[in-house]
Amino acid sequence: LFANLGIAQIEQLVESQSLSLIDKMVTKLQADGLIVHINPMQEWLQPEGDIYTHSPLDLIKILLEKCPFPIIVKEVGQGFGPESLRSLLELPLAAIDFGASGGTNFALLELLRANQTAQENLSPLAYIGHTAHEMVEMVNVLSENTANQCKHVIISGGVKTFLDGYYLTSKCKISSIYAQASSFLKLALGTYEELDAYMQIQIKGLSISKQFLRIKS
């Protein structure tokens, strides 16, 4: 169980010298660590979004120095580019969560809340990003870097089924798991039994895939 904060909130706490509040929050929640989400495009397109004044990378480094618990860094719909991935892999993070392009487009959802002029002119920006497949390829290239300290990734964003998850985790050269959100959330609106049945089918499908399928090199 991980707590969750945005990098914008981390920035505010750093500026007010109140990072100890994060430690208190994680302790009070009995969480195993903290997920920090970085979503610059979403913030820029959100009518009341927070615009970062410090480098998110610098803020994460400060957080790693001050906080004793595991930290996961994630994107929220656009994914990370190669330079961001390179820098993050070199940090002692518990994991990097892709939050790749192809899943729920939170930047677009925020833009739809803006005025008509903003929607008409800024909409192309909402579709900029990297897919999970592209990010796996980037990670594979960067995996040879001996300076890497982060050894785990969570492949998320546009993962529709167990076949997507099996393919992407098999393709990835470093330790990886995959995550799905949209399909689970849709079923979560129904009964627990429906959600559990779907989850069991996904697990079974993944097990079958691991036994019978091999990806093409």
Locate the predicted segments by residue.
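Alpha/beta catalytic cores of nucleotide-metabolism and tRNA/nucleoside-modifying enzymes
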Residues: 122-154, 160-217
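Non-catalytic positions within long, well-ordered alpha-helices that form the structural scaffold/packing
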Residues: 26-27, 89, 169-170
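Hydrophobic faces of well-ordered beta-strands that scaffold small-molecule active sites
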Residues: 1-5, 32, 36, 71-74, ...
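Short glycine/serine/threonine-rich phosphate/pyrophosphate-binding segments
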Residues: 81-83, 105-106, 161-165
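Active-site entrance/lid segments in N-terminal catalytic domains of soluble metabolic enzymes
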Residues: 1-86
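Glycine- and other small-residue-rich loops at beta-strand/loop junctions that grip anionic moieties
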Residues: 14, 49-52, 73-77, 99, ...
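Short, charged, surface-exposed secondary-structure boundary motifs
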Residues: 12-14, 106-109, 187-191
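Glycine/Thr-rich beta-alpha phosphate-binding loop at enzyme active sites
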Residues: 31-58, 84-86, 91-141, 183
